Design a protein with these regions (language model features):
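S-adenosyl-L-methionine-dependent methyltransferase catalytic module, highlighting the catalytic core
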Residues: 2-109
Length: 109
């Protein structure tokens, strides 16, 4: 749920010049990340938007989507310690990328 802490940890554990390849729910048209839900101190979940669940091969019920990222994710990655961030999109059935374009964030420490 704390994606900024996760980004800092990615940057911390990567070697200098290490590279992070990240996929995450992303809204092309959104300049800012949409926070859909928050984890409370008591472990409960506060829903700020109607719950959305994404596919999970382990749990048939899916995984709760806590946020859908906007373009500000690039700034958050830089703030976390990445010096270069780029975004690419792909659609390639032969590699299993179906449906809408898959977005990849590539961040170098």
């Amino acid at each position: 749920p704390d994606y900024q802490a996760a980004l800092r940890e990615f940057a911390r554990v990567l070697r200098p010049d290490g590279c992070l390849l990240l996929t995450a729910p992303f809204l092309f048209e959104a300049p800012h990340t949409l926070i859909r839900a928050r984890l409370q101190a008591d472990g409960s979940i506060q829903h700020l938007e109607p719950p959305v669940y994404h596919g999970d091969p382990i749990n048939g019920e899916g995984v709760l989507c806590f946020q859908e990222f906007g373009w500000d994710l690039c700034d958050a990655m830089r703030t976390a310690g990445f010096r270069h961030v780029e975004v690419i999109s792909a659609w390639a059935p032969n590699f299993g990328y179906y449906g809408s374009f898959q977005v990849f964030f590539i961040a170098r420490r």
